[in-house]
Curated annotation (Swiss-Prot):
Part of the 50S ribosomal subunit. PANTHER family: LARGE RIBOSOMAL SUBUNIT PROTEIN BL19M (PTHR15680:SF9), RIBOSOMAL PROTEIN L19 (PTHR15680). Keywords: Ribonucleoprotein, Ribosomal protein. This is Large ribosomal subunit protein bL19. Belongs to the bacterial ribosomal protein bL19 family. InterPro entries: Ribosomal_bL19, Ribosomal_bL19_CS, Ribosomal_bL19_sf, Translation_prot_SH3-like_sf. The gene is rplS. The lineage of its organism: Bacteria, Bacillati, Bacillota, Bacilli, Bacillales. One of its GO terms (cellular component) is cytosolic large ribosomal subunit. GO terms for biological process: translation. Signal peptide: none annotated. This protein is located at the 30S-50S ribosomal subunit interface and may play a role in the structure and function of the aminoacyl-tRNA binding site. GO terms for molecular function: structural constituent of ribosome. Disulfide bonds: none annotated.
Amino acid sequence: MQKLIEDITKEQLRTDLPAFRPGDTLRVHVKVVEGNRERIQIFEGVVIKRRGGGISETFTVRKISYGVGVERTFPVHTPKIAKIEVVRYGKVRRAKLYYLRELRGKAARIKEIRR
């Protein structure tokens, strides 16, 4: 039974996504269904956490929209994500960047690294 579950989850895993870590700025292209039509919506922000492993792995992206912080959590291997672009690689010393929720303006900047 365990082998069967592993085989099914292995074929569901996506391999077309770029490597990214907390602190990186991503542009996530999400498929949104409105009525009978489907369109792509772009959500761009900083990855503040990545958790789990395998098929249940998720990541959370935070952005500021009209002065309000918006966080959205995505499963990594969902078919709802059309593609992920890494806009900027950030250098941070934490795995979970919850402290960014309290910071405003220039204090919330993340140092950029070249890769």
